[in-house]
Amino acid sequence: MFLAFALSTKAMAKEPKGTLTLRVMTYNLRYGELASLEQLAAHIKAFQPDFVALEEVDCFTKREDTPHQHNKDFISTLAYETGMFGLYGKTIAYRGGWYGIGLLTKHPYINMEKVLLPNPENKEPRALLYATCEVGTDTIVFAVTHLDVNSSKTRALQAETISRQLEKSPYPVVIGGDFNAPPSESTIAKIMLPRWFNATDNAPTCPTWEPKVKIDYLFCRPQARWQLITTQVVQSRLSDHLPVISTMQLLPRR
């Protein structure tokens, strides 16, 4: 397996007392077409993340182009192989099984919820999946999404729905996902960035063989309580997206 690490550091500071440090990853798996689940799990596990947001996650499907993944439960296998808890959110029935998004968490979860996102053009359904997790003495909401690929207007509606839903949380929130939008699009520039802490940089994440565009992100709220320590786009060929992993700190309430 070829791995090269492109590390960019955006902030370095002494850790205040009571600060919580988290390592979080987002990874679009391309429904396991380019790698085995064991390879993907080993790749994830190597970074020892606290949370992983996963997109294009199959369960019991039988795709013609992925015979090596037939009838496999992606999230359960990845959870077992990484030693993490796994949560799954189906978005569509597909090829004898389901297709959707998932979460891996090193920390126990209290509850979870799936919210279907606006779909005005009646295209592929999209969802927000989130879980409330206990991290030591702290409580964190961790979320994943995968926005519409066709319409910037639909993506903006979906991002607005996500923001409004998660802004209700009494706890700090981290969301990762494939937003299918470059940083300049209103989905990111006018909806996410003004209201969320950006826990990545603008390094391109897709496609793996010649990265040209950034569409994979990690965001946190409330903005004032988060500090980014490192962020990296990992060069690998196990999917058509490059995984993004960031280490961030949740600062104490002032």
Each PLM stretch: what is its role?
Residues C59-K72:
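Short, flexible/disordered intra-domain loops and linkers
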Residues M1-A6:
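Bacterial N-terminal signal peptides
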Residues V24-T26, A53-K62:
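Acidic/histidine-rich, surface-exposed loop or edge segments in extracytoplasmic proteins
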Residues A11-F51, F85-Y88, I92-R254:
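Active-site regions of metal-assisted phosphoester/phosphodiester hydrolases
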Residues F74-M84, L104:
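Charged, glycine-enriched surface loops/patches
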